[in-house]
């Protein structure tokens, strides 16, 4: 079968499409899935180039990708067809999901074995051409839930600033913060993406045309915001600390973020930890199905263009998600 592998850390050029990868055998609580689409995320290029802490846990050669959509083939030893059916995962069912933390096997392969609890059925009415959105949903969706609900604990009346409002995670942080009761959400992004931020329910701050710090200061009369959800971190974390209201929280999404500057100032800072559960995946199904989580896919590329996809990820200005189509 075809799969993406890399045998050393480095740039996008280390990614290779192999055509003779062995088909995996599912463990007892795993499901074998025929993959149709793979969602890509900045974490993928950070693992590939060795900068993520997860890279030290990787055995090379390794695969790439954390999330996917596809069709159930069969279950492992403890998951016969009846048991799969009781979970809504009968053979032939279209599903989406992601690798749980600690499972570093890639998803960019024609067939993968993946934990049954890390999958949820795609609604039957979803057309095939809509599957890229589902392939790109799990990681950003579960990250956003962990950031808003677990780390920031956004609640009624909170004011929220999202750094990176039109990235994959940012497009879900905004509606989830509003869903949690936020009274006002501002989101930074390029001026060209201001309308998209408005559509998501936030007030845009065009960082390429105005000073976001001055704008937040003006909009909050110098009080600052209750919560900062920071998908950028490197250029935004430290200055954000000057715009946190008393008792406020800052949530940087990069897992290697240094929280010391915040804690030294008595500001609550928490890095979200993704929890992969069927309950949370089903919440994403409802949100996407009902239009509450309008995740955008910017590009769909064939598997053979994996290096190009990683180049786009590294550029850092991707709007929405980049998805691989294994049938293209």
Range-by-range predicted roles:
Residues 83-84, 94-164:
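NAD(P)H dinucleotide-binding glycine-rich loop of Rossmann-like/cofactor-binding domains
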Residues 211-223:
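Short amphipathic alpha-helix with an adjacent loop that forms part of the alpha/beta core around
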Residues 104, 234-294, 325-328:
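Glycine-rich phosphate-binding loop and adjacent beta-alpha segment
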Residues 1, 281-328:
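C-terminal hydrophobic helical "lid"/dimerization subdomain
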Residues 134-209:
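Mid-domain Rossmann-like dinucleotide-binding core that forms the NAD(H)/NADP(H) cofactor-binding site
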Residues 22-39, 52-101:
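Glycine-rich beta-strand-centered segment in the early N-terminal region that forms part
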Residues 39-40, 79, 99-111, 192, ...:
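Short, charged beta-turn/beta-strand-edge "cap" motif at the junction between a beta-strand
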């Amino acid at each position: 079968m075809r799969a993406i592998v890399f045998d050393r850390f480095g740039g996008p050029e280390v990614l290779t499409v192999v055509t003779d990868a062995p088909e995996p055998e599912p463990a007892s609580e795993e499901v074998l899935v025929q993959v149709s689409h793979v969602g890509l995320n900045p974490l993928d290029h950070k693992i590939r180039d060795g900068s993520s802490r997860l890279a030290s846990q990787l055995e090379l050669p390794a695969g790439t990708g954390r999330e996917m959509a596809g069709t159930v083939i069969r279950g492992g030893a403890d998951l016969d067809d009846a048991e799969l059916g009781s979970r809504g995962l009968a053979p032939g069912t279209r599903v989406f999901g992601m690798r749980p933390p600690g499972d570093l096997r890639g998803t960019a392969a024609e067939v993968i074995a993946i934990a049954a609890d890390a999958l949820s059925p795609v609604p039957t009415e979803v057309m095939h051409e809509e599957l890229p959105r589902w392939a790109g949903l799990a990681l950003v969706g579960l990250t956003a839930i962990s950031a808003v609900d677990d780390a920031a604990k956004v609640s009624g009346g909170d004011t929220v600033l999202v750094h990176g409002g039109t990235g994959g995670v940012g497009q879900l942080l905004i509606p989830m913060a509003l869903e949690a009761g936020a009274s006002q959400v501002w989101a930074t992004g390029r001026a060209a993406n201001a309308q998209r931020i408005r559509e998501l329910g936030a007030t845009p701050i065009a960082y390429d045309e105005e000073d976001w710090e001055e704008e937040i200061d003006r909009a909050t009369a110098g009080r600052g915001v209750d919560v900062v959800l920071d998908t950028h971190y490197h250029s935004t974390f430290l200055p954000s600390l000057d715009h946190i209201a008393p008792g406020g929280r800052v949530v940087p999404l990069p897992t290697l973020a240094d929280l010391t500057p915040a804690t030294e100032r008595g500001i609550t800072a928490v890095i979200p930890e993704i929890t992969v559960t069927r309950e949370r995946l089903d919440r994403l199904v409802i949100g996407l199905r009902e239009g509450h989580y309008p995740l955008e896919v910017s590009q769909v590329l064939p598997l053979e263009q994996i290096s190009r996809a990683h180049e786009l990820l590294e550029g850092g200005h991707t709007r929405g998600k980049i998805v691989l189509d294994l049938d293209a």
